[in-house]
Amino acid sequence: MSRRGNVKKRPVPPDPVYNSTLLSMTIRRVMRSGKKSLASSIVYNALASVGEKTGEDPLEVFEKAIKNLTPLVEVKARRVGGATYQVPMEVRPARGTALALRWLVHFSRARGGRTMESKLANEIMDAANETGAAIKKREETHRMAEANKAFAHYRY
């Protein structure tokens, strides 16, 4: 166990265009090799595309997608007497959001398509409509937790 104190959580500054911390976090997840301006242009163009295709406010569609992707429970491995159990645990809100963003970006990259902008836009729209690979991942996580409900008393 570490003897040091807890690390202070640093606040995430909101993005300059939509003034949203959620978008700022997404830009950081999309960013590769420190190219933040490229990442932000990808995210903003994807949102513009979402706005065109849906005819709704792109930020609202994005927030709905993240809400749909956020898991409520997950399983964590816990070793008890030589056996490893998958113990279902509730997900804290900050971790749930982080997982949702991670899945959104990961499955956008894995998706077929020409540009990252179009792939991200399509994944956002799919998540808002409760379809797509990222939603499937959340459902799978919930199924795993449901299947291992018997080990819930091993919670720590």
From Swiss-Prot:
InterPro entries: Ribosomal_uS7, Ribosomal_uS7_bac/org-type, Ribosomal_uS7_CS, Ribosomal_uS7_dom, Ribosomal_uS7_dom_sf. Part of the 30S ribosomal subunit. Contacts proteins S9 and S11. It comes from the Bacteria. Keywords: Ribonucleoprotein, Ribosomal protein, RNA-binding, rRNA-binding, tRNA-binding. The keyword Ribonucleoprotein applies. One of the primary rRNA binding proteins, it binds directly to 16S rRNA where it nucleates assembly of the head domain of the 30S subunit. Is located at the subunit interface close to the decoding center, probably blocks exit of the E-site tRNA. This is Small ribosomal subunit protein uS7. CDD domains: uS7_Chloroplast (cd14871). One of its GO terms (molecular function) is structural constituent of ribosome. GO terms for biological process: ribosomal small subunit assembly; translation. PANTHER family: RIBOSOMAL PROTEIN S7. Belongs to the universal ribosomal protein uS7 family. One of its GO terms (cellular component) is cytosolic small ribosomal subunit. The keyword Metal-binding does not apply. It holds the Pfam family Ribosomal_S7.
